[in-house]
């Protein structure tokens, strides 16, 4: 059988980059396989996926050497429009691939661009919505969807032209457990239809039953590969050596259950009394019971997409005003200005808070202790990237840059919204160790997360919004 994906001696160097991002990559993938690209953040997974869907070098200019053919299309030679019907793509952030403001139009968009007649488009939209069980999402505003719902619609849109190959780049990094289960089912549906699936992913537990082979990248090179059986036989310590996350979350979930029963540790620093969250008094999001956060503790905040975790964080740090109730700082009511002065928020989409021309400048922006910059950069594996532009980094590397800036801010309250989104096991552990160091300084950390491995290993207690 002819491979649907074939690469030999592939090198790729981004424009203005001093070193290649991919080096001597050689592999083949057979039709109908589900393969997973794994490795530490910045190892080249995303760049490789861009070669498969034609985004590199068409939209991400650079020098390509070697041969990389996906679905019969040669990277660097085929026109980008030739990839559209053959290769479907789902990105880490679904907002980056939306072209319409309602879900039905978003699904129809690929077919409209391909010149299909209206009746055929309507039939495909109906059939795709049925196949992926997203009929209730049709006709909805994309601005009113949860993160998981947005990713479902993006996945369905990528399948509208019946591609031979699906390329998924960190599709679950911002999803809750229920949304991840739905993503699993969508991938399973496409695999059953004979579609080849290539996943670049750090989270492994949700997809192990569907993956046929694993490709491990390190420093831009393909250094190891395993069949599903070989990967399942790897001892846990080997996974840790490779910087890979666990194959199962059972132990993590048991630990989180224990931590959900714990109360505030120590004297409360920040308290909430019947605080109502939302953007409009006529339609409040939710009212919280009394909550307390102690100095020197790490609190995980969990719950499904759209439940109000980020709204709570924005309210606590002074970016939003509560619709009702009282927020106190060391027993005294604190207004938005006071809360903003005492807190640092690391956003879920860190692209909104990257302003400087180099990684080092970004980390030092607003730093209270610039003398600690080198130490923090070293701990977060950013030392070799000091002079790089933040927007030239991988998603996981950008996340670490903003986390580093938070570490140097010297704010007593640090709120982290999905701080390990897109991070490998080693980087997640580094973030956890730095959180512990901040805790030792008496700081309070509120960590909004779907990352069960992070919550189980590093949070003192867990609050789950339901």
Regions found by a protein language model. Name each.
Residues 141-145, 149, 389-393, 397:
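Conserved ABC ATPase signature
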Residues 166-169, 414-417:
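Catalytic Walker B motif of ABC-type/P-loop ATPase nucleotide-binding domains
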Residues 53, 317:
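Helix-to-loop junction immediately C-terminal to a conserved catalytic motif
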Residues 176, 424:
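ABC-family nucleotide-binding domains
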Residues 61-74, 325-339:
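Conserved ABC transporter NBD signature motif
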Residues 119-137, 371-385:
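Conserved ABC ATPase "signature" region
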Residues 159, 406-407:
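ABC ATPase C-loop
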Residues 201-202, 449-450:
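H-loop/switch region of ABC-family ATPase nucleotide-binding domains
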């Amino acid at each position: 059988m002819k491979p649907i994906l074939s690469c030999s001696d592939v090198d790729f160097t981004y424009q203005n980059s001093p070193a290649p991002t991919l080096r001597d990559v050689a592999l083949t993938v057979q039709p109908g396989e589900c393969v997973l690209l794994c490795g530490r953040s910045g190892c080249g997974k995303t760049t490789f996926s861009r070669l498969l869907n034609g985004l590199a070098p068409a939209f991400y200019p650079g020098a390509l050497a070697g041969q990389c053919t996906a679905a019969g299309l040669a990277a660097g030679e085929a026109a980008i429009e030739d990839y559209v019907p053959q290769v479907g793509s789902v990105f880490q952030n679904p907002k980056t691939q939306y072209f319409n403001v309602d879900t039905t139009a978003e699904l129809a968009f690929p077919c409209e661009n391909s010149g299909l007649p209206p009746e055929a488009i309507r039939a495909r939209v109906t059939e795709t919505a049925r196949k992926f069980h997203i009929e209730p999402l049709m006709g909805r505003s994309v601005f009113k969807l949860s993160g998981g719902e947005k990713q479902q619609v993006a996945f369905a849109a990528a399948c509208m032209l019946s591609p031979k190959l699906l390329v998924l780049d960190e599709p679950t990094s911002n999803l809750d457990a229920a949304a991840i289960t739905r993503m699993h089912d969508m991938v399973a549906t496409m695999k059953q239809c004979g579609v080849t699936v290539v996943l670049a992913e750090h989270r492994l537990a949700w997809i192990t039953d569907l993956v046929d082979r694993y490709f491990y990248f390190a420093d831009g090179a393909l250094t190891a590969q395993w069949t599903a059986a070989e990967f399942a036989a790897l001892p846990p310590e080997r996974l840790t050596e490779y910087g890979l996350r666990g194959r199962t979350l059972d132990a993590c979930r048991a630990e989180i259950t224990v931590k959900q029963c714990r109360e505030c540790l120590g004297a409360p620093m920040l308290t909430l009394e019947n605080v109502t969250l939302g953007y409009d008094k006529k339609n409040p999001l939710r009212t919280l019971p009394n909550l307390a956060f102690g100095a020197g503790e790490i609190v995980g905040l969990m719950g499904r997409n759209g439940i109000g975790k980020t709204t709570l964080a924005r309210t606590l740090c002074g970016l939003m005003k509560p619709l009702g109730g009282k927020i106190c700082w060391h027993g005294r009511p604190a207004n938005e200005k006071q809360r903003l002065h005492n807190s640092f928020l690391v956003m879920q989409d860190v692209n909104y808070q990257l302003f400087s021309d180099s990684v080092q400048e970004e980390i030092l922006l607003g730093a209270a202790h610039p003398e600690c910059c080198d130490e923090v950069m070293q701990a977060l594996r950013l030392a070799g990237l000091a002079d790089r532009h933040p927007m030239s980094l991988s998603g996981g590397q950008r996340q670490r840059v903003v986390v580093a800036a938070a570490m140097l801010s010297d704010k007593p309250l640090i709120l982290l919204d999905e701080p390990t989104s897109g991070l490998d096991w080693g980087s997640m552990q580094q973030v956890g160790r730095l959180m512990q160091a901040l805790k030792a300084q008496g700081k309070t950390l509120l960590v909004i997360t779907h990352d069960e491995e992070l919550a189980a290993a590093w949070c003192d207690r867990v609050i789950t919004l339901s």
